[in-house]
Amino acid sequence: MNILVIKSSVNEKKGSYSSHLSDLFIKFYLEIHPEDQIEVYDLNQFGLANTNLTMKNFEDKTFYQKAESDFWINKLRNADKIVFSTSMTNFNYSATTKNFFDAITVPNKTFLLDKNTGKYTGLLKNIQNVQILTAQGAPLGWYPFGNHSALIKQIFEFLGAKVRSDFFVLDGTKVAPNNQKPIADFVAQRQNQIKILAENF
């Protein structure tokens, strides 16, 4: 089983809640499936982190080259399952995540459009499950219009992936008393939930 782990928080260097979630999830998963192949990618280490889609690079097609679109699409095609982590940034997923989805959402590569019927068909049907792990500073419900986790789920489903696992949101990271705790300690408080997700993945 090939597991593709993608980290897409902008806080990776100083410490990311969502990245800690991902690391803990993989730790539990490997305890159950030590034979599986794990590939981990921090999107911040690649060109797409600083390559956003614009009118110019869309028209001249350079966006897809600079963002290494084919590289990421091939990674997705070769994966059996995905673990995707990111944090909320200004009520949405990170700009790095947006760049990633722009790079992989490509007609005739990851989805088909029937122009006669308007029907879309996702092509990433090889992906058997996606575990979405996110973090946000506000408690759940403070910003009902900012459901970044559900949006990520819907995009993967649009592209043909199966998302059987419930997404997990580590919320309230910026409010007291949570913001007074070390990241690892706060994440550890939810480790039983993460372990169950890993067992069912």
From Swiss-Prot:
Keyword Oxidoreductase: yes
InterPro entries: Flavodoxin_fold, Flavoprotein-like_sf, FMN-dep_NADH:Q_OxRdtase_AzoR1, NADH:quinone_OxRdtase_FMN_depd
Keywords: Flavoprotein, FMN, NAD, Oxidoreductase
UniProt remark on cofactor binding: Binds 1 FMN per subunit.
GO molecular function: electron transfer activity; FMN binding; oxidoreductase activity, acting on NAD(P)H as acceptor; oxidoreductase activity, acting on NAD(P)H, quinone or similar compound as acceptor
Residues that hold FMN according to the record: S9, S16, Y17, S18
Named cofactor requirement(s): FMN
Top-level taxon of the source organism: Bacteria
Record-listed E.C. numbers: 1.6.5.-, 1.7.1.17
Catalyzed chemical reaction(s): 2 a quinone + NADH + H(+) = 2 a 1,4-benzosemiquinone + NAD(+); N,N-dimethyl-1,4-phenylenediamine + anthranilate + 2 NAD(+) = 2-(4-dimethylaminophenyl)diazenylbenzoate + 2 NADH + 2 H(+)
Listed PANTHER family: FMN-DEPENDENT NADH-AZOREDUCTASE 1, FMN-DEPENDENT NADH:QUINONE OXIDOREDUCTASE
Homology family: Belongs to the azoreductase type 1 family.
Subunit structure: Homodimer.
Main function: Quinone reductase that provides resistance to thiol-specific stress caused by electrophilic quinones.
Protein name: FMN-dependent NADH:quinone oxidoreductase
Organism in which the protein naturally occurs: Mesomycoplasma hyopneumoniae (strain 7448)
